[in-house]
Amino acid sequence: MANSAQARKRARQNISHRNRNMSLRSELRTAIKHVRKAIGSADKNTAQAAYQASVATIDSIADKGIIHKNKAARHKSRLSSAIKAMA
């Protein structure tokens, strides 16, 4: 239990930061799912448009430190490879 005023404030901040981080992480997963769904639809133009939108989201979340920049690069690379592999 937080006893000092400083510890109580940090506990409050941790809750709000955790909620924000969970929301952003969910946004990341949703962006990736949209691209995967577009790839599954076999429409390359739609997939590329979804990919472009997701890249901005992925980079934004990586810049905020929610995920590591290498993880962001890995996601983008795999999505890009999947789009390039489309016929």
UniProtKB/Swiss-Prot annotation:
GO biological process, one term: translation
Basic residues bias locations: 7-20
This protein's GO CC annotations: cytosol; small ribosomal subunit
Ranges for region Disordered: 1-25
InterPro entries, per the entry: Ribosomal_bS20 (IPR002583), Ribosomal_bS20_sf (IPR036510)
Keyword vocabulary terms for this entry: Ribonucleoprotein, Ribosomal protein, RNA-binding, rRNA-binding
GO molecular function, one term: structural constituent of ribosome
Family as reported in the entry's similarity comment: Belongs to the bacterial ribosomal protein bS20 family.
Function: Binds directly to 16S ribosomal RNA.
Xref: HAMAP family: Ribosomal_bS20
Protein name stated in the entry: Small ribosomal subunit protein bS20
Primary gene name: rpsT
